[in-house]
Design a protein with these regions (language model features):
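Metalloprotease/metallohydrolase-associated module, dominated by Zn2+-dependent proteases
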Residues: 1-7, 80-121, 137-205
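Surface-exposed acidic, glycine-flexible loop patches that form ligand/cofactor-binding
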Residues: 8-11, 52
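Acidic/histidine-rich, surface-exposed loop or edge segments in extracytoplasmic proteins
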Residues: 10-25
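Metzincin-family zinc-dependent endopeptidase catalytic domain
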Residues: 27-143
Length: 205
């Protein structure tokens, strides 16, 4: 699940991304979040993302909670009015949101993940919500092979989504661009992205 308002411009981080885990759950899955962040770092060519142990340095905060404590965590992060709306319209096990400035640069993302719902759901949630927190937050049911389709559960960072994130974080795609501006630069971007994704996944080009 995502919370970011209308989607009509490119939103992305325009600098280093530092991820902090606030653990309120058992089992403690902080090490697994670190593994996911490292995997994302290795697969997105132009993204500087890593963990931090200093909450003040973080611009992405991942809150791990028990399933029974999820409503309380949503209320704390989003406030009572918005929390009621979230819980009335959805039954989330994980969610992400971000704030952006007037130039559509993401300034902070918040991710909430249930830690005690099993390994597969945990990894599926962490990958999906962390990646959505980086900007591609428009869920769609039209494409069957992406984790950004809420009807699909993967639990890993698949090839198609690697294309999406590598296009988004190519330096030629700037915060605030509209769809026409992005389409105009795609012919220059795609050969680089295809070569990168093929190389890191040992694919034949």
């Amino acid at each position: 699940m995502h919370l970011a308002g209308a989607v009509n411009r490119i939103r992305k981080f325009d600098g280093p991304v530092r991820v902090y885990v606030e653990n309120r759950a058992r089992p403690d899955r902080g090490a697994q979040v670190s593994q996911v962040v490292e995997d994302i770092r290795a697969r997105i060519q132009h993204l500087d993302i890593t963990m931090t142990e200093n909450a003040a340095e973080a611009n992405v905060v991942v809150t791990l909670v028990r399933d029974r404590d999820l409503p309380r965590a949503i209320n704390k992060i989003y406030g009572p009015d918005r929390a009621q709306l979230i819980q009335r319209s959805l039954v989330p096990q994980c969610l992400a949101s971000f704030r952006k400035d007037e130039s559509f640069r993401i300034t902070r993302s918040d991710v909430i993940v249930v830690a005690d719902a099993g390994d597969f759901i945990f990894y599926d949630c962490v990958y999906e919500e962390l990646l959505q927190a980086l900007g591609p937050i428009n869920d769609t049911s039209l494409v069957p092979w992406t984790m950004f389709n809420d009807n699909v559960q993967m639990g890993f960072f698949d090839i198609y989504d690697q294309y999406i994130l590598n296009v988004l974080y190519d330096p030629r795609v700037q915060p605030g661009m509209d769809s026409d501006e992005v389409r105009a630069v795609l012919p220059q971007i795609m050969p680089t992205v295809r070569a990168w994704v093929a190389r890191i996944n040992d694919l034949d080009q």
